[in-house]
Amino acid sequence: MSNLPFLLEIGTEEIPDWMIVPALGQLRDSVQALLDGHGLQGKVSWVDATPRRLALRADGIIERQPDSKEVKKGPPIAGGQRAAEGFAKKQGIPVESLTQEGGYFVGVKMVTGRAAADILAADLARLIRKIQWPKTMYWTGGKTGPRFIRPIRWLVALLGGNVVPFEIAGVQSGAVTRGHRKLGASSVPVTVENYRDSLAASGVILAAADRRRKIETEIAGLLEGTGLKVHADADLLDTLVFITEHPTPILGGFDPQYLELPSEVLVTVMRHHQKYFSVEGADGKLAPNFIAVMNTNADPEGLVRRGNERVLRARFNDARFFWQVDQQKKLADRVADLASVTFQAKLGSYLEKT
């Protein structure tokens, strides 16, 4: 009996970055529990994801469960031969094979193992729908339709060289994935073995670790010889890894006049509003530069860079306006305004609390 590899891909609209890793953990555990529970002997080899797909591979799955014996407890011996014959007929076993134990007829039934493909086909839709998300949505069939974090657009399920057939919300599983929205094809045939390479050829870097490495390496290349260094931000890096399928960093700049604002204001605008890395000079002070990560492979004409610079300039202008307005009134002079902010209906305002 040969051992088979299994590939599952759930293709969706873009999933929020912070929800992806927990979902992958659930998917891994659910598939492994399915394999273990049915005695299929396989092990999940890896799980990985991009914003548009959750993917899993398992290896060593046997084609069919081993046949097994199931002991069935029958009617009391006092019921006689007729009871024994009825029990044997119901179980599909010869009446002469029955034994007597503890005052009851007992039969041993041979159970033919199910094909792994049939088990997977029967359970995969349930496992996918069982993934727990902080929020879910309907996208077809109204409130009677399935719920998921984002609409499911395609499904890949392959056991060895064969499709494992199942369906969710009218989407049938197959052997065709989708490439990068801009760099790849909308229809990419795959096998279990060429899955990663086929995605790569269609502009998708499947492994989160590879996307992370690409971002870090290319940022280092951008800053080499400039005397600048990126402000390390592990959380932002995690976000960028899971909002891109083909990340490419670009170095942009802004007018040094904005450095008159507190660095905390500028970094907050770049990091939280634009998902940019801030950049520091050799002296450790904020430099008039930033690093954005685009979801494509190149910006030969600088259009993406200039677009990001234009957006950041507008953000900084807004920040400067509010900073200047805030400075027109001392903090101590704002205490009286707390009278209009309720702390708790029965306890009074924040001024009274202060």
Predicted regions and their residues:
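Catalytic nucleotidyl-transfer cores of nucleotide-processing enzymes
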Residues: 152-153, 231-352
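Long, basic N-terminal domains or extensions that often function
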Residues: 1-266
